[in-house]
């Protein structure tokens, strides 16, 4: 087990009480709803206009992020339940149920008489049934596409019966149109679609498209931030930091790059925990209901040894986003590593897996808890599930070999050999590979004797 011991070295502290949740009245009064935003169907459009479907999804996502009533389900989770060529209603119903959405925002874009027609639809999921309704279509010349689709977030919010103040409506409308350049927005939408495909090729394509987007509009704040996210996924942390800082300089009221800087500080080789806390706090100041920033703040406080503060931050995150698997993973870690609370930890990890069956982090954490408790068969099952999702997950392969040493030495040899074959090609695994070879030699010697 490679990670649990490291967590324990943070030190055990007794939690005397959970932090009181001090929430902004406007946010506390709103019940969050899990929504899935999907690209609109553009199968009838020519190739040059296919990007418009992703463009609508991005405009909706940016706009609805400004209100606590909408908890957006990460689109990356859609890949685990299936991604069709076009998002027709049957596919939307299946996927929305698979990711536990309460509502799905989708639709179709067609072209008629030289004009673009956007037909938005809304699916509200209820136990046993789903009800889909069509919203008022938008018809426009292509040149007005960016301005008109920016109307959709408010249209959906009102259809979902979300009460909006004038200030909230203005924020949503402004965020829904992140650039005045249609060409920059097209490149941005294409870049986001490439990033969502994942993999090295998809991310490199996304970086190229997003770089062109901010060349077209140097003041495209969301473009700078998104390019930073892609660089971070490509392990280019310095390039990522440069883009995040550029975004904060262009618009100091945009919270996402501050949260992203917090993530970079937290993962830095040096212990930049204070800087991480400061960055997360800034993001929360700008958007008090920013659940992921509360999770990051909890992680930073846990790293500093402030266990009570960490749990308080996680609890706040759950208020704003009760369906975020990452929060439950963080609670699972801290409950066991810092408090020794086995049942609470297992419950938290299982809740994360219930919300996202492909959550590698949750299954790794649960496997490590089982392993530490001597529940080796259960641990093996979790590590194998991780490898099913990611066949090159060296941490799961290493842990699996260790556990098999307890129950089946011959199988442990097989697992060590598989781990060494893969990990020996990775510079970051060098020290672990050396340890693995020692285990392998010892096992072979014991079995031979």
State where each predicted segment sits.
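Catalytic-center loop of serine/cysteine hydrolases
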Residues: 32, 58-59, 63, 70, ...
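Alpha-helical segment of the N-proximal tetratricopeptide repeat
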Residues: 182-216, 263-266, 299
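Helix-start (N-cap) detector for alpha-helical repeat units in TPR-like alpha-solenoids
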Residues: 184, 221-222, 255-256, 291-292, ...
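Position-specific recognition of the canonical hydrophobic site in helix A of tetratricopeptide repeat
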Residues: 195, 232, 259, 266-268, ...
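Structural signature of tandem alpha-helical TPR/SEL1-like repeats
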Residues: 201-208, 233-246, 267-282, 303-316, ...
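Terminal, low-structured helical/coil segments at or just beyond the last alpha-helical repeat
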Residues: 406, 413-449
